[in-house]
């Protein structure tokens, strides 16, 4: 299991300062919408300058009509990121075209499809998709695998079921990881790193428990022990 550190701080300088503290550790730097829109592609180069071994996870959750998505994913791949997210709800046709475009490259990022955001409660998900959360997450994951993507973004609570349905080689990335499960904030379906590993998660995403800590490096070292 691998650790992705979410770079969601208010200022670019704060994100870079955090990475300076974590230099030399085996982790992924997750760049989301806030940081990428504010700081641009140059931010990715600044991450690499701090530690060239950091892998970069560009979490943009692309969601649009097929060719627009595919073209956007191609531009992201040109930035030499190691992982990229797309929405599974964009449908099989969009994902298939996207993967055809990326598979023509010599090197491409891992493509992870978002099934159900961890901010969804069961009730909220049902009101939007008119289906039980876990059932729909598995259904979307099956479609994603048929489209050729590498894995899905899901909560810890769907990870094992997805692995059982689609095999251990189909990757699961689980956000909503907390040191204390009572600290939900804007997440609904949270778990800790040990539970993520028990449920066969390949990647975990941790943000606030790291960057709000007095000693972020110590928190990361503890998390890496559980990975």
From Swiss-Prot:
InterPro entries: Aldolase_TIM, OMPdecase, OMPdecase_AS, OMPdecase_bac, OMPdeCOase_dom, RibuloseP-bd_barrel. Coiled coil: none annotated. Transmembrane segments: none annotated. Substrate binds at residues 8, 30, 59-68, 118, 178, 187, 207-208. GO terms for molecular function: orotidine-5'-phosphate decarboxylase activity. GO terms for cellular component: cytosol. Keywords: Decarboxylase, Lyase, Pyrimidine biosynthesis. The active site is at residue 61. Its EC number is 4.1.1.23. It comes from the Bacteria. The keyword Lyase applies. One of its GO terms (biological process) is 'de novo' pyrimidine nucleobase biosynthetic process. It catalyses: orotidine 5'-phosphate + H(+) = UMP + CO2. It is an enzyme of class 4 (lyase). The keyword Transmembrane does not apply. Pfam families: OMPdecase (PF00215). Pathway: Pyrimidine metabolism; UMP biosynthesis via de novo pathway; UMP from orotate: step 2/2. SUPFAM superfamilies: Ribulose-phoshate binding barrel. Catalyzes the decarboxylation of orotidine 5'-monophosphate (OMP) to uridine 5'-monophosphate (UMP). Belongs to the OMP decarboxylase family. Type 1 subfamily. Homodimer. This is Orotidine 5'-phosphate decarboxylase.
